[in-house]
Amino acid sequence: MAASRNASTANTNNAASTAPLRISFAKIKEPLEVPNLLALQTESFDWLLGNDAWKARVESALESGQDVPTKSGLEEIFEEISPIEDFSGSMSLTFRDHRFEPPKNSIDECKDRDFTYAAPLFVTAEFTNNETGEIKSQTVFMGDFPLMTNKGTFVINGTERVVVSQLVRSPGVYFDSSIDKTSDKDIFSAKIIPSRGAWLEMEIDKRDMVGVRIDRKRKQSVTVLLKALGWTTEQILEEFGEYESMRATLEKDHTQGQDDALLDIYRKLRPGEPPTREAAQTLLENLYFNPKRYDLAKVGRYKVNKKLGADEPLDAGVLTTDDVIATIKYLVKLHAGETETVGESGREIVVETDDIDHFGNRRIRNVGELIQNQVRTGLARMERVVRERMTTQDVEAITPQTLINIRPVVASIKEFFGTSQLSQFMDQNNPLSGLTHKRRLNALGPGGLSRERAGFEVRDVHPSHYGRMCPIETPEGPNIGLIGSLASYGRINPFGFIETPYRKVVEGQVTDDVDYLTADEEDRFVIAQANAALGDDMRFAEARVLVRRRGGEVDYVPGDDVDYMDVSPRQMVSVATAMIPFLEHDDANRALMGANMMRQAVPLIKSESPLVGTGMEYRSAADAGDVVKAEKAGVVQEVSADYITTTNDDGTYITYRLAKFSRSNQGTSVNQKVIVAEGDRIIEGQVLADGPATENGEMALGKNLLVAFMPWEGHNYEDAIILSQRLVQDDVLSSIHIEEHEVDARDTKLGPEEITRDIPNVSEEVLADLDERGIIRIGAEVVAGDILVGKVTPKGETELTPEERLLRAIFGEKAREVRDTSLKVPHGEIGKVIGVRVFDREEGDELPPGVNQLVRVYVAQKRKITDGDKLAGRHGNKGVISKINPIEDMPFLEDGTPVDIILNPLAVPSRMNPGQVLEIHLGWLASRGWDVSGLAEEWAQRLQVIGADKVEPGTNVATPVFDGAREDELAGLLQHTIPNRDGERMVLPSGKARLFDGRSGEPFPEPISVGYMYILKLHHLVDDKLHARSTGPYSMITQQPLGGKAQFGGQRFGEMEVWALEAYGAAYALQELLTIKSDDVTGRVKVYEAIVKGENIPEPGIPESFKVLIKEMQSLCLNVEVLSSDGMSIEMRDTDEDVFRAAEELGIDLSRREPSSVEEV
């Protein structure tokens, strides 16, 4: 009863009633839903295109009185570049009104056929002849523009990619102080950093001289720059006379007047060129005052205005003399120790240095802006072409079409999507990894930091990250702290700064009004936590409230002094981190591993949502886009495995197609299953079909397994894991993996390759599963080395003997020289063929030049869990399976239930992640149900208020981060679980159970913690790592085997291993390893021969690497000779002839093209 009565409040998922029931322990009512988790990608791209969705958002924002940009991204660039004038200014070309035609191919066709999902872009171009006033207007095609899918991805050449948002230093003016090493004095410096163009840097050094650095060149006195800008010595003294530093600088400055100063600057910037006044003037103009060369961007102008108290309009993208004066003034005031001043606009401004790692000074460049910058470079290259063509072509014959060359624009867009560091192959391991990938914030990439140069400060957690970037989720390793994840409630404002929402507090009264604040706005306020106790009148219950102030300081203040309050306890963490139950009990380092490992979980054959969730499961799965959601409300009309048809309330029909066993980027299986029935009433946004790793529309990355924390015969030493055979035989942790194999038939110099069943020297049983085209049939079971697609390649014509010519004449072309280049299943792979795609040039398919046919074969394999696979919980508790026990050997509860998995209790205390222990207790409670509806204890009262006092067995529960089940609630509930049919409770109120040894039937001496934990199977599967080689490819130069599984390489017997054999005196073993097993080319062929013929192994020869060493020494002009034991010179082989001779005598076919380098593989 309680559960259903309270389903809507207890259901901490979305407000819509479509989410499955999940009883929540949350005590805090949140005034705000989690926003759309993909908005970061989609809204930015909408702005770039200027589509209807963006226009609607702008209108509603303007109505509500917000200041938002009213120009779309592409519109901005076309306006920026227009007009393109020729050198004399007699003709010009302008662009306006861009529009898109519908894309040529659908998303699925693009994935299938390796196309890019793009729409043709058209622009109206007007050519004006200024002398005659004649205007010619034309619509010009500007190339295909890649479009974003509704999931926030791009399909480029058939693969899904994500453009990651970049975290960069915002343009603006920055003041900094550092201590001089020699004199211990503070050195103050200022930098004006534009969005593009030359930096202007100033500093006051230890001698109190104010210097300026123009465009990273040598330092000069700042007064030289002021004089060059037209100021006289008197004006400088009048403005800056009260500051000792400026007076001293002026005295040291020997330039006389503007001309002298300009020439002085020119000499420093362009040493070796003859200085003239005009050239110097132009140089300075071009550096800082020419909008084509210098741009602060709106955000830079906004930051400069804010810092210096100026009132320039936001579209003033170049510096003004006033900006330079104000910067110098601010710097000398900072040096003089003043703390506040009045800006040009009359505003009071604080004089202080800036913190570069503060999120008020770092901004996000998201997809729209990154692509916009790329298009801008392309258009700038095109502009040069247009100018040249204007001068060379006949004025009468010119039309916009003849002037414009779209190649550079198309090339720069293609280059960005194909090769930029920020355009990444999408992580599609499971829906969460895709979602997190799209919400990633990356400080690397062009214009960002580099791994090597990034110090500790940039990587560290900063107080201004709160509610903006997750402090937990970041990679381990060299990128730690440089790659982050957007916090759950964060959003990006028009300037690119991350905003986070806060509830307004008015005179101690907490309201439901929400304000979004950027990091530097937030610094002015006093902010209370989300869990601050509130009375029924929405005022703070305690006299003093714990708050944060600027710079992360914590303080207690009266309720009336509080300005804002957090909207939600999970405000500071990202989506993945918010899915860790009892996060508040885990050490941050382990939580980081937990958040990262959830992204590596493999979708299982049957998904199961967690018994213990956090209420974030529904929203994350729904927004990730791997489930099918209803676009409109209506009724389900028809359901099958492949599609769902709905009749909508407005009279229209929609058919939703489902993906069946298609391959993700990571080779996991993407399969959607219907969860509605015909005749069901549906509402907009309801989940109609589950995707991979989702159940009933909730994220379901793993399985709920019965865990016991106990040592077992030492098999779970060092985080190893013991599993029950049940998980293997019932396919509890089995997953499906799909591999794609591709082969193409090309035109070669000797003739075309052919896909055929007619392969030389191959027996009929090998071809049994190939159809008449030579392509394997669907449903065939294949193992390593089986032929998937038969293909022959013409071999070079050799001189024929008369007998062969006779045979040719009699039997026709049959004996023609071809060699077998069929596509075979690679080593270590096995599975069932589930799909074949054939593309043929003759049937009109677009294929790359020189390719006549292309065949793709999809092989699926079911991987059961096995020893060596890696499992993990959600708390960073990971381990490798060491042993799979028979069910009858596993420890069992008093009612005979065997546990599924045994973990080592020693893995908990030192790792400081007891969240996993609380999870097993709550998991047990959820599986058994409880009833505390009549109790008077304080903890039970809390549960009665939120409707979590009576729960049926097997009900999913939610314990949201920082607002979940308390320890006293768990302890109390363990005493009131619903007993089994014998009236017994298997787990004692302590949370431990009496377990019995499955082998002897004896009880273990102590009670053992038992409960349900959510276990993930990670993508580190032992089948993908196992590898063995007999013969295979060799490196071109050293002739040694390649390394690594991908190259089918050998195991390196390294320096230290050699020492070990030397220590044992195993001379022959060592000699074999260094010669015939590695790079003695002749020797290894002869050994093959001896083994084939059953003879003794011959003497090893000279290793190839020795010859390489000698060649290297010869290249350094050292003549090295090799002498035998009797002092005779030994000839070194320079050709491979004798190898081929030996091989031919043996009948070993060396013509089979083994890849000879890593590149070729």
From Swiss-Prot:
Domain of life: Bacteria
Annotated EC: 2.7.7.6
Molecular function per GO: DNA binding; DNA-directed RNA polymerase activity; ribonucleoside binding
Catalyzed reactions: RNA(n) + a ribonucleoside 5'-triphosphate = RNA(n+1) + diphosphate
PANTHER family for this protein: DNA-DIRECTED RNA POLYMERASE I SUBUNIT 2
The family this protein is said to belong to: Belongs to the RNA polymerase beta chain family.
Protein name as catalogued: DNA-directed RNA polymerase subunit beta
Origin species: Streptomyces coelicolor (strain ATCC BAA-471 / A3(2) / M145)
Originating gene: rpoB
